[in-house]
Amino acid sequence: MRLVVGRIGRPHGVKGEVTVEVRTDSPEERFVVGKALETDPADVGPLTITAQRWHKDRLLVRFEEVPDRTAAEQLRGVFLVVDSAELPPLDDPDEFHDHELIGLRVETVDGEAVGEVVDVLHHAQDMLVVSGEKGSEVLVPFVRELVPDVDTAAGRVVIDPPPGLLELGR
């Protein structure tokens, strides 16, 4: 499975450097000089990192295949991806890679079927996007109080939603 580790933003300067919106907890491992990253759309890459640096909390990256600002502008919005097989296992049993959660069935603590995890959003609060009946979607804050059990081996997530949460998506 391919996982997004970054999204290319606008060019920085005239020599082909781009800003990268980092979408990984370990950018120091993902954005290493010499590493070739696959892309989405796939026909744009792979892109080989020749330089990277932090500037005002932004990651700036230069790719071998991008000689100037014009070429860099063409990459705006392209996703940088890695194969999930490259990821090391997590040490904390309460941490999960997004791809481990997507596709799990969701049920309440009472055993009522709710739907399936279709995405994980990383905003101020991590949210599970749960697709329910008739295509409805509900956002469930990914906190222990509301998600007391994640059993990837059994393929399920148990939620304890407050009154009204599940009705928001219907």
UniProtKB/Swiss-Prot annotation:
Keywords: Chaperone, Cytoplasm, Ribosome biogenesis, rRNA processing
Lineage: Bacteria, Bacillati, Actinomycetota, Actinomycetes, Streptosporangiales
Subunit structure: Binds ribosomal protein uS19.
Listed InterPro entries: PRC_barrel-like_sf, PRC_RimM, RimM, RimM_N, RimM_N_sf, Transl_B-barrel_sf
Protein name: Ribosome maturation factor RimM
One of the GO BP terms on file: ribosomal small subunit biogenesis
Keyword Disulfide bond attached: no
Purpose of the protein: An accessory protein needed during the final step in the assembly of 30S ribosomal subunit, possibly for assembly of the head region. Essential for efficient processing of 16S rRNA. May be needed both before and after RbfA during the maturation of 16S rRNA. It has affinity for free ribosomal 30S subunits but not for 70S ribosomes.
Localization per Swiss-Prot or TrEMBL: Cytoplasm
Segments forming domain PRC barrel: 93-165
Family membership noted in the UniProt record: Belongs to the RimM family.
One cellular-component annotation, GO: cytoplasm
Domain comment as written in the entry: The PRC barrel domain binds ribosomal protein uS19.
GO-annotated molecular function: ribosome binding
